């Protein structure tokens, strides 16, 4: 598959075939979800899609004020759905590893199960950025912190899997077309992961490749517990991540290839609920707006299947064990 063709397929994907119509009103009563980065962008759009389902949804993010504003906006919809979800705030700062266990403990104090977590949060960082623990900023917030958070919640995922329908308990990671465009050879360059950001898009692409590695290794480790772990590229979407551009450039790229955030939420909806995502496709990579395909670069696919996913997972574990 040529690189131009795969880019075209990611930048201009076919229409979604799995939408909110496939996750009916009231269908998720009794289920508990976490969506990180849910006060804006794709995460916010996903909460809106899931609001009629009756689930309990934790809207996780760094700013309590923005989280509450998002919850107020979504719950004020008129007319109200017949089985509205219960939306709860969860403070989570992925730039600071010392806050992660507290966030997981706050969730566990309220819930006895977790059916799906969408590890969606994570933006771009300028050159020179590091997390509060000195990890390259993209790696810290997109990979190390989300893996720690998910690991802390693992007992609740396992608890849900014991009684939930087969293959319905899922961990959803977030990839990007930047894996193809900017990730280093083999996906992750371990010589750069503990240094400040040296190239914003290359380091972002490496972190997104890291997310797929975590999905692959998560599938290997958690599959026996009935947990499905996948990585999805939501697509090129009009979200706050592009606000760094001036108005002219922003208008140009929106006109060329940015879709409404709702379309990215459809990719996430597919990843969380489609029957195509199951034990047989555990560890899969999902293209916009809901298509299971291999990652678009052969070297990244090869690295993930030849032990680099395990190596990356273990590096993430060592990184947080130094600090928490």
From Swiss-Prot:
* Applied uses, from the record: Iso-A82775C is a precursor for the biosynthesis of the anticancer natural products chloropestolides A to E via a Diesls-Alder reaction with maldoxin. In the absence of the prenyltransferase iacE, siccayne accumulates instead of iso-A82775C and can also be condensed with maldoxin to produce chloropestolides H to K, which show also antibacterial and anticancer properties.
Answer yes or no on keyword Acetylation.
no
State which Enzyme Commission number(s) the record gives.
Answer: 1.1.1.-
Lineage, top-rank taxon, reads Eukaryota
Annotated function: Short-chain dehydrogenase/reductase; part of the gene cluster that mediates the biosynthesis of iso-A82775C, a enylepoxycyclohexane and biosynthetic precursor of the chloropestolide anticancer natural products. Within the cluster, the prenyltransferase iacE prenylates siccayne to generate pestalodiol E, using dimethylallyl diphosphate (DMAPP) as cosubstrate. The probable oxidoreductase iacF is then involved in the epoxidation of pestalodiol F to pestalodiol F, which is further converted to pestalofone A by the short-chain dehydrogenase/reductase iacG.
The active site is formed by 204, 208
Q: Which Pfam families match?
A: adh_short
Q: Is Nucleotide-binding a UniProt keyword of this protein?
A: no
Give the family per the record: Belongs to the short-chain dehydrogenases/reductases (SDR) family.
The entry summarizes the disruption phenotype as follows: Reduces slightly the production of iso-A82775C.
Q: What is this protein called?
A: Short-chain dehydrogenase/reductase iacJ
**One GO MF term:** oxidoreductase activity
Which key words are in the record?
A: NADP, Oxidoreductase
Q: What PANTHER family does its record include?
A: RETINOL DEHYDROGENASE (PTHR24320), SHORT-CHAIN DEHYDROGENASE-RELATED (PTHR24320:SF236)
- Pathway this chain belongs to: Secondary metabolite biosynthesis
Enumerate the InterPro entries for this protein.
NAD(P)-bd_dom_sf, SDR_fam
Native species: Pestalotiopsis fici (strain W106-1 / CGMCC3.15140)
Which residues of this UniProt protein bind NADP(+)? 42, 66, 93, 120, 204, 208, 239
- Which spans are transmembrane here? none
Q: What induces it?
A: Expression is co-regulated with the other genes from the iso-A82775C biosynthesis cluster and probably controlled by the cluster-specific transcription factors iacI and iacK.
Q: What class of enzyme is it?
A: oxidoreductase
């Amino acid at each position: 598959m040529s690189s131009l063709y795969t880019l075209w397929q990611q930048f201009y994907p076919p229409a979604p075939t799995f939408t909110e119509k496939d996750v009916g009103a009231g269908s998720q009563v009794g289920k508990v979800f976490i969506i990180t980065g849910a006060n804006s962008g794709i995460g916010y759009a996903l909460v809106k899609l899931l609001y009629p389902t009756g689930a309990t949804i934790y809207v996780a993010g760094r700013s309590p004020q923005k989280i509450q504003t998002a919850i107020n906006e979504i719950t004020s919809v008129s007319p109200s759905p017949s089985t509205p979800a219960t939306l709860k705030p969860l403070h989570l700062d992925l730039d600071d590893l010392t806050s992660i266990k507290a966030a997981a403990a706050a969730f566990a104090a309220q819930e006895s199960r977790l059916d799906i977590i969408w590890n969606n949060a994570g933006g771009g960082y300028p050159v020179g950025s590091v997390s509060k623990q000195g990890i390259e900023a993209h790696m810290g917030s997109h990979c190390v912190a989300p893996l720690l958070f998910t690991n802390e919640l693992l007992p609740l995922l396992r608890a849900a899997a014991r009684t939930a329908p087969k293959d319905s308990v899922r961990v959803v990671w977030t990839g990007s077309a930047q894996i193809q465009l900017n990730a280093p050879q083999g996906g992750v360059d371990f010589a750069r992961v503990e240094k400040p950001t040296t190239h914003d898009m290359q380091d972002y692409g490496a972190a997104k490749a890291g997310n797929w590695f975590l999905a692959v290794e998560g599938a290997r480790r958690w599959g026996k517990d009935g947990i499905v772990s996948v990585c999805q590229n939501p697509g090129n979407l009009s979200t706050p991540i592009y606000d760094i551009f001036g108005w002219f450039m922003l208008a140009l790229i929106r006109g060329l290839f940015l879709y409404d955030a709702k379309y990215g939420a459809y990719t996430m909806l597919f990843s969380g609920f489609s029957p195509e995502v199951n034990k047989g496709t555990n560890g899969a990579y999902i293209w916009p707006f809901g298509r299971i395909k291999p990652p678009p670069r052969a070297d990244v696919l090869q690295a993930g299947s030849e032990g680099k996913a395990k190596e990356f997972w273990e590096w993430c574990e060592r990184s947080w064990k130094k600090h928490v």
